[in-house]
Curated annotation (Swiss-Prot):
The keyword Secreted applies. One of its GO terms (molecular function) is cysteine-type endopeptidase inhibitor activity. Residues 260-285 are annotated as: Disordered. Keywords: Cell adhesion, Disulfide bond, Glycoprotein, Phosphoprotein, Repeat, Secreted, Signal. This is Alpha-2-HS-glycoprotein. The modification Phosphothreonine is found at residues 132, 312. Bone marrow. PROSITE patterns: CYSTATIN_FETUIN_A, FETUIN_1, FETUIN_2. Glycans are attached at residues 96, 153. It comes from the Eukaryota. It comes from Oryctolagus cuniculus. Transmembrane segments: none annotated. One of its GO terms (biological process) is positive regulation of phagocytosis.
């Protein structure tokens, strides 16, 4: 009996060593293919943005490549991005957008992606992002007089945007513009003024003929614009400087018919954003906030000074393929280093990659 047990143990050990465990291989973060996947991920972010500003790739932090059955492989990617000066509605190509500098109170994004590579094609399976402005301490060390981001719901910000849009409409020979979103604001100490950036939408009214703005409707072919304004506080009056850039009209996208199989979802048009939605705490899905019949109350969201990328993908489920893929990043993996021999010594992982602009 003892001999049989010993033979059984030896056979089980043989099976364990004979069958290779599923593992990933680590990838050079500055490898051309890794950069290609990262740029695809950034495009995915910007294509889903309806508010805030476009982001650009700053650094690739980590790349893991998982095998997938029956074919293909999945890139698990961590990247850093930086906010640009191009609004999400601005059709300017990302390559022509300037990165917002540290002295302008830069915003950094942190994103996790899973991207499928199959038959030479890349497809985003899942995305998770958040973004954070640079700390006030770091900015003031570099530039003591630089204004910081101001909460978008500040009364002075709302008044400045309204005053700037009113001033622009009074001199505008085209369509009457309505406010869509206050995107960014700063309180400038000297001279005392409020700097604000906001988006607008054209209506079916002529600006100089409007008597009742409530009767003006947005155009069927949506046409948006982006405005920058400085409203200075003078004695008994305000001094307004405002410029607006109107983008080409967007053609109407056909709405999916109810009950039609395979109908594609249409992104909603941007809307006025008086308050940001409450996001679930880190590590919790929206469904986890409900325990039996009891709804767990959430604290009100703090005033925000920028559009957090977390809201772009909030509530969006993972799109990981259910076709029997061998992709389990939650399990303890076997790491396979590419082109690494069996020689003893520490393995140097070529990650994180290079910083393309600056790190905050």
């Amino acid at each position: 009996l003892v001999l049989l047990l010993s033979l059984a143990q030896l056979w089980s050990c043989h099976l364990v060593t004979a069958v290779p465990l599923l593992g990933y291989r680590e990838h050079n973060c500055d490898d051309p293919e890794a950069e290609q996947v990262a740029l695809l991920a950034v495009d995915h972010i910007n294509n889903h943005l309806q508010q805030g500003y476009k982001h650009i790739l700053n650094r690739i932090d980590k790349v893991k490549v998982w095998p997938r059955r029956p074919t293909g492989e999945v890139y698990e990617l961590e990247i850093d991005t930086l906010e640009t000066t191009c609004h999400a509605l601005d059709p300017t190509p990302l390559a022509n957008c300037s990165v917002r500098q540290v002295t302008q109170h830069a915003v950094e994004g942190d994103c996790d992606f899973h991207v499928l590579k199959q038959d030479g094609q890349f497809t985003v399976l899942s995305a998770k992002c958040d973004s954070t402005p640079d700390s006030a301490e770091d900015i003031l060390k570099l530039c003591p007089d630089c204004p910081l981001l101001t909460p978008l719901n500040d009364t002075r910000v709302a008044q400045a945007a309204e005053a700037a849009l009113t001033a622009f409409n009074e001199k505008n020979n085209g369509a009457y513009l309505q406010l869509v979103e206050i995107a960014r604001a700063q309180l400038v100490p000297l001279p005392a003024s409020t700097y604000v950036e906001f988006t607008v939408a054209a209506t079916d009214c002529v600006a100089k003929e409007v008597t009742d703005p409530a009767k003006c409707n947005l155009l069927a072919d949506k046409q948006y614009g982006f405005c920058k304004a400085t409203v200075a506080e003078k004695v008994a009056r305000e001094e307004v400087e405002v410029t607006c850039t109107i983008f080409p009209a967007q053609p109407v996208v056909p709405q999916p018919q109810p009950g039609v199989a395979g109908a594609a979802a249409v992104e909603p048009a941007p809307a006025v954003d008086p308050a940001s939605p409450v996001s679930p705490p880190d590590g919790q899905s929206p469904s986890s906030l409900v325990v039996g019949p009891v709804l767990v109350a959430q604290a009100p969201a703090p005033p925000r000074a920028h559009y957090d990328l977390r809201q772009t993908f909030a509530g969006v489920p993972s799109m990981e393929s259910g076709s029997g893929e061998a992709f389990h990043p939650g399990k303890v993996p076997v790491v396979v280093q590419p082109s690494v021999g069996a020689a003893p010594g520490p393995v140097i992982t070529p990650c994180p990659g290079k910083v393309r602009y600056f790190k905050i």
